[in-house]
Amino acid sequence: MSESTGVSTIVVGVDGSESSILALRWAGALAPLFQASIRAVTCWQFQIAVGTFTPVLWNPDEEARKICAEALSQAFGDSTPVDVQMVISQGPPAKVLIEESRRARLVVVGSRGHGGFEGLLLGAVGAAVAEHAKCPVLIAHGSDLPPAFPEVAAGPSTIGSNQAGSAHAGS
C-alpha cells in the first residue's frame, strides 16, 4: 500500500503474545469505524550471541508467518476480518512499526510482548512506537475491550461479522 492510495490502514504489532492478540482484537473492532484495512506486522531478527551459530535449517520468515497466522486465529477465530494483510519483516520491531506508521491511520500495539519484564506496564517496543510513530498509537492494556465493543469482547465467534460492523455503524 502506498501513501497515495488514500486507503485507511491500521497497523498492528504481532508477536504472538496475549497482549498482541488483544491488539489485534482492538484493530478488528476499530477497522469498521475507520473503514480501514489491517496490517498485522510480525518482525524477526537474528540474535547475535558469542559462541553460538544460527541453524542452517531455520526459516525465520516461515516461523514469523506461523506466529502471525496463529495470533490472527486466536484473535478472530473463523471470523478474521476480510481486509487483513500479514506483513513479515526483518528488523527491530520498534523500527519496523515506526516505518509502517508513515502510511497508517493508527498503530496498535500490546502493552507488553514476549521477553518483557513481568512487572512493566509498557514494553520497550510500545514505548518507542508511542514516542516516534507518525500517526496516533493505541496501546492495548489489560485483557478486554471496552463495553462499546461487546461483540468483540465476547470472543472470536462474532468478530468481523456483518452484524458486528452494522452494530458500530449506528452508534
Write out the residue ranges for each language-model feature.
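Small/aliphatic-rich secondary-structure junction motif
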Residues: 2-54, 146, 156, 161-171
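Gly/Ser-rich helix-loop-strand patches that form or flank binding pockets
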Residues: 103-149, 157
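A short acidic, glycine-rich active-site loop
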Residues: 56-67
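Short, well-ordered secondary-structure micro-motifs
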Residues: 23, 50-53, 96-99, 120, ...
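Charged docking surfaces used in two-component/phosphorelay signaling
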Residues: 88-95
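A short helix-to-beta-strand connector/capping loop
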Residues: 77-85
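A conserved short alpha-helical segment within the catalytic HATPase_c
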Residues: 68-76
